[in-house]
Amino acid sequence: DPDILKLFGFGHRPDPEGTFPTITDDDDRDAGHGTLLIRQAPELLFLERCIDWLKPGGRIGIVLPKGILDNRTYINYRRWMLSRCKVDAVVTLHKNTFEPDTGVRTCVLFLSKPLEDDPVPGDYTIFMAQSRRVGKDSKGEPVFALDEKGSATSELDEDLTQIAEAYKTFRDIGTFTESETCFTAERGELDDNLNLNPQHYSPELNATLEKVSKFDDKPDWSVTTIGQLDKNIRIYMGPRWSSRSLVV
């Protein structure tokens, strides 16, 4: 609905520099460099409005589709968000978190808006976590932790409690014991894509990649990407693996 989209900066195309129009004039909401879109993802409009309505000095936790964190088509939206808020924490959720109702991969963003006269910090530490156990299966049935004998206990097999405790410690004293689940990244070290996906900064994953890259230093060994082997190769996951575009 154009009457709704024109109320949002995200309802318009960004300019060549990647900025969105500021919507201030009730009588001419489509003024400026932005071109009104035909449609827009509701979650992006929701994100914009949440940040707009957040008072200076306020904090917010918001559940969003995981793709917002690193999808290249969303880079301008991430840039807009980072220019207005400090990202306190990013937590990616297990695929069963909202099952059996939906299997959409989601994340939680914790944002804080600086006081009115304060700029958004240029560099700071971001708490990051990857939830790998949510205490239930895809049907919504509980999954319990096992004891040392392999028998089910009365405790759910989940790591959200651990993540919450680590984040509380991080907020209270500015540090915590990092693990495969919880770690940090620096705002100033975000790549050109402004990637906010914790997986990209996982110590476990990066240690593995570093081990693989060392093979490049060995005689008769070479490390390269699949795309460098054949530019026509496409990789699909799940049921799309049998696509004609896939080279195995």
Which residues does each predicted region cover?
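DNA target-recognition patches
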Residues: 1-25, 195, 199, 219, ...
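Conserved Class I SAM-dependent methyltransferase catalytic core
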Residues: 19-97, 102-104, 108-111
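Non-catalytic DNA-recognition/assembly elements of restriction-modification systems
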Residues: 166-238
